[in-house]
Each structure stands twice: as structure tokens, then as C-alpha cells.
Amino acid sequence: MEEYQVYLELDRSRQQDFLYPFIFQEYIYGLVYGHDLNGSILVENVDYDNKSSLLIVKRLITRMYQQNHLIVSSNDFNKNQQFWGYNKNLYSQIISEAFAIVVEIPFYSQLRSSLEGAEVIKSYNKLRSIHAIFPFFEDKFTYLNYVSDVQIPYPIHLEILVQILRYWVKDPPLFHLLRSFLYQYCNWNSFINPKKSISSFSKSNPRFFFFLYNFYVCEYESIFLFLRKKSSHLRLTSFSVLFERIYFYAKIEHLVEVFPKDFLSTLSLFKDPLIHYVRYQGKSILASKNAPLLMNKWKYYLISLWQCYFNVWSQPGTIYINQLSDHSFHFFWGGYFSNVRLNLSVVRSQMLENSFLIEIVMKKLDTIVPIIPIIRSLAKAKFCNVLGHPISKPVWADLSDFGIIDRFLRIRRKISQYYNGSSKKKSLYRIKYILRLSCIKTLVRKHKSTVRAFLKRLGSEELLKEFFTEEEDILSLIFPRASSTLQRLYGGRIWYLDIIFSNDLVNHS
């Protein structure tokens, strides 16, 4: 019990005061105002001390201010007049952007210390890597029997995002300032169309919104993983230590009322160590090899958690539990599709004079090439038209020949590195053809020639040799050609370790 209490106890000494950095408002306004508001000011890999003092914050803001040379000169007087006097929305946006920069500093150090010190989070930290998703699907997923695709719901109101911060912040004026930012973009008292309000806010203030949303997901997953680790049965004693926290602990008694009380003695014998949890974008996957009864238990856990703690309305019918032997599961992450499909194999066996047929169902992880969404994205990026016919890229025509080829090569390599694992490569060849011909037409546009004349003049030159070289040839230069191991590796699944970003060309929203 003491172990649970230590983990769940809210450490008041680590709560943060956030308003004091705003005494350096001239630095903050200049820092954010001079930067592109549509971009992001990322503070990466900075070893912040856990003791974030006033002096540390002042030095950091001053250093960022000086490095970006964002001093507003007197020549910008007219523009500043419009900024300070008339454009209130931009004024609020600048303050909120600066606010997001400031509050990320102590939360970064606190999150890092939590990841280093809490045993509950340590095992989960390994799953934060993007690379861990692909081996999971390849090595684990095909051996599981039940899967549930869960859509993480958005909070019905932005006030819920603000309330989540109350567990970590003890500065009441901070929340008034926070609400004043949100009030600029949506009607605070309106519940008619919350999705539209959240969508408009996320577009106008992306960094600020993602800070709140990521904190919401982090809070949800921390509670979920605690339940996952500590509640291997449904006894009420497992949750008796949870009554300390605001809101959630006041309503946690509803969380254990998942099944009738007659089942409690039976369910206490079940263990569920094989519940796998994977989150990608705004969705998550629950998969298990056990009976569907345990999957139903966790489904109602999630429903009760969202309703009781986050006040998010979600119904059990929105979460479907499917059996992989009867259901082909589609997985989408960062612009990439994967599919677990079933292969039916018929084996003829003969025993003495009798022969019989045995049907074996095998699950196989296969990658799908979403040809229509990719062509739509290529057309949006001006590589082809809506019908998939390649066109030149005019904005790249001013680059050098090497620069043009290098940019096309990067895009093609990123797509090829993932989709080469697909068993159906016809669609992939079409994408490669579009990129190749678009590259040639861009070079033709630069040299003011025709495609036929350019290719004829190119002749024996090896300018496009790398672009037309397939990945099989590139791998054969790295490994021995006569190696049969290479053929077996390439014929199977190869997850390239440089797939660390989402596919920008595919946007399914």
C-alpha cells in the first residue's frame, strides 16, 4: 500500500510557479514576435536542472533572445503600433506562444526525472520509440488472438485540459491567464460544437494546443499504465489507495463496477500479463492472446476512466473487440498502412493407406501501398496532377541539378524503405515512375529543353544513375552478391531504422 501511495502522491514541492518568468516580458514578446508564428521554437536536449529558479529562467530567455537577434528596432514603429494597438488576436497569440515556451521548461525536467525515477514508467519508456512499433507488429502481433482499435477521445471542453494542470501547478493566476488565451479562440461557455472550437484553436496556436493535448494524453496513459501494472484482478483493495486524487478518486468506485459482483471472486483468479498497448497518433491498440473476457474488462476500464476522470463521453459500442482469425486488421501510422491478413494453406497428409487434407490458417503481416492517397498527396505537392500524370516542380527549377535529384531521391527513398516490404509492388512502381518522370521534367524545365532532347543529350552521363538504381542493387553493394542470406533478408521484412518521421506525402485527414 505504501508503494502505491508513494507513486500516486502528489508532490507539492515539485509544483511550479509559472508567472514569474513574465517579468521578462520584453524578451518573451521579442522572442516570439520575431519568430515565424507558424513555425516552432524547439528547445531540444537541454539539461535543465530540476531546481528551475528565477535566475535560470532569466538566463535561458536572455540567451534565446540574443541568439535570435529579435530586438525590435525603432524603424518598426508603425508595425508595432498596429501590433500593440489594434491586432488583439495576434497579441494574444504571441503571449500564448511565449507562455508555451516558458511552461515547457519545468515540465520537461519533471517528466525526465519521472522517467528516470519511476519504475512504473521505466518499462513504458521503451515503448515510446517509433522503432518499437514495427518489431511489435512483426514479432508479437501475429501471435495474438484478439485486438481492439481504440480512438482516444478529445476532451469535450478545453476547460478539462486546464484542470489537468491543476495536479502539477499551484499558481492560481496561471489558470486565469490560461483561460484568457483560450477565450480568444472559442466561446468558453459553449458546448454546441466543441470539436470545431478545439480544431480552430489547434490551428491558430499549434504549440500551445499540443502542449495541453500531450499533457492530457500523458495523464491518461500514466493512470492507464498504473492500472495495467497493479490491477491484475478486479478486487476493490487494488484501488483503495486511489482515493487521494481530485475528481478521479472521488469517482473511482464506478471503475470497479464493470461486472456484476458475483463475478468478482472468479475474475480475481485471472491474470492479464499479455495485454499489449500501442499508441499511434490519436489512436491506440489493445491486443491480447487471452480470452475476450479480459479484453472486455479493459474496454470498460477505459470507458469508465474517460467518463469519470476526464468527463469525456464515450460508449462501449465505439470500441470493437475483433478476433484476428476472423478479422483482417488495418494499422495506420504516420502515413503508412499495414495489414494483418490471413493466408489459408492446404496440406495433404498421408498415413499408411489413408490420406486427408489439413487446412492451416496463418497470419501474415503485410504492408499496403495506399496508391490513391499518395497520388492525391503528390498532386497537392505539385509532383503530378490529380490523375497521376507527372509534372515538373517549378519551385525547384532554380536549384542545381544535384540539388533537384537529391530532393526527389530523398522522397522516393523514404517511400521505398517502408513499402518495399509489400507483397504487391505494382502500386509502388507507379509512385516511383511519377517521381522519376517529375524529376526529369523539372530538369528539362530548368535547362529549357524537351524530355526527348534532354534524355538524348544526357546520353551516357550517369547523372540519374542513382535515381534509377533500385534498393536491391544498393543492398548488393553493401552485402556480398553471392550471399543467400541477403536474399532471405530482403525477401522478408526489413524495417529501416531511419524511419523516424511520419510520411509527409500522405495526409488522410
Curated annotation (Swiss-Prot):
It is found in: Plastid, Chloroplast. GO terms for biological process: mRNA processing; RNA splicing; tRNA processing. InterPro entries: Domain_X (IPR024937), Maturase_MatK (IPR002866), Maturase_MatK_N (IPR024942). Pfam families: Intron_maturas2 (PF01348), MatK_N (PF01824). GO terms for molecular function: RNA binding. The keyword Plastid applies. Keywords: Chloroplast, mRNA processing, Plastid, RNA-binding, tRNA processing. GO terms for cellular component: chloroplast. Usually encoded in the trnK tRNA gene intron. Probably assists in splicing its own and other chloroplast group II introns. Belongs to the intron maturase 2 family. MatK subfamily. This is Maturase K. It comes from Dalea purpurea.
